[in-house]
Amino acid sequence: MILGLALVPSKSFQDEVNAYRKRYDNHYAQIMPHITIKPQFEIDDHDFNLIKNEVKNRISSIKPVEVHATKASNFAPISNVIYFKVAKTESLDQLFNQFNTEDFYGTAEHPFVPHFTIAQGLTSQEFEDIYGQVKLAGVDHREIIEELSLLQYSEEEDKWTIIETFTLG
């Protein structure tokens, strides 16, 4: 079973992000807009209830998270990914650090950069054109996310689905 943990924003902000993703993200149909808290990890099916309990325990002291998408940014030159940057907060860091440890399926491969991906899989020319447009349009969105979502990847459908949510705080 392949799982991941993410913060999923309100439907209205998902719609705003998806307006870009429909055009510029070749993974649009595979997963909803989200902030990755724990990248994919694999468990045995019989460990599922253990994972659910572990997630509940690890978030018991973490309050709902304020998310502020502040501007368009990118991961160039490492990869041609454009995203809405989310201001890093103590709560976001705490949530990320709870799940990116050796005792929970390993540490993160990359530093934590909270964001909502809006474009990926771009050529260099597409990247330059799209980044200029998105940067001009800008973003300034705030909301409180009260749940951490557990997602499962289906290899058959090549898609991520929320299978459980956990209330923060």
UniProtKB/Swiss-Prot annotation:
InterPro entries xref list: 2H_phosphoesterase_YjcG-like, Cyclic_Pdiesterase, YjcG
Q: Which residues form a coiled coil?
A: none
One GO MF term on file is: hydrolase activity, acting on ester bonds
Presence of the UniProt keyword Metal-binding in the record: no
Q: Where is this motif: HXTX 1?
A: 34-37
**The protein's Enzyme Commission number:** 3.1.-.-
Q: Which cystines does this chain contain?
A: none
UniProt KW keywords: Hydrolase
Q: Where is the active site?
A: H34, H115
In which residues does the motif HXTX 2 occur?
115-118
**Pfam families reported for this sequence:** 2_5_RNA_ligase2
Q: Which family does it belong to?
A: Belongs to the 2H phosphoesterase superfamily. YjcG family.
Q: What is this protein called?
A: Putative phosphoesterase SERP0604
What organism is the protein native to?
Staphylococcus epidermidis (strain ATCC 35984 / DSM 28319 / BCRC 17069 / CCUG 31568 / BM 3577 / RP62A)
